[in-house]
Amino acid sequence: MLIPYDQLEPDTLTRLIEDFVTREGTDNGDETPLQTRVLRVRHALTKGQAVIFFDLESQQCQLMLKHDVPKEFFD
């Protein structure tokens, strides 16, 4: 299930993004400041390049690139 980013509380969205950008394996040695990485993800969400996907099976939200989400979730 896709969750519109603009329907989340601002603080919840920020924490979700921060969790994503600080996860092990996502920085690849990148020393870009946290705030810059958060802004990049926000930009991708507003441009529709990234989405928030809620996996019903695992009961977890994750940020994904739009092209990585199965097409049936956009119908």
UniProtKB/Swiss-Prot annotation:
So which domain of life are we looking at? Bacteria
**InterPro entries on file:** UPF0270, YehU-like_sf
Q: Which NCBIfam families match?
A: PRK00304.1 (NF001441)
- Which HAMAP family does the entry mention? UPF0270
Q: Which family does it belong to?
A: Belongs to the UPF0270 family.
Name of the protein in its database record:
UPF0270 protein PSPTO_1630
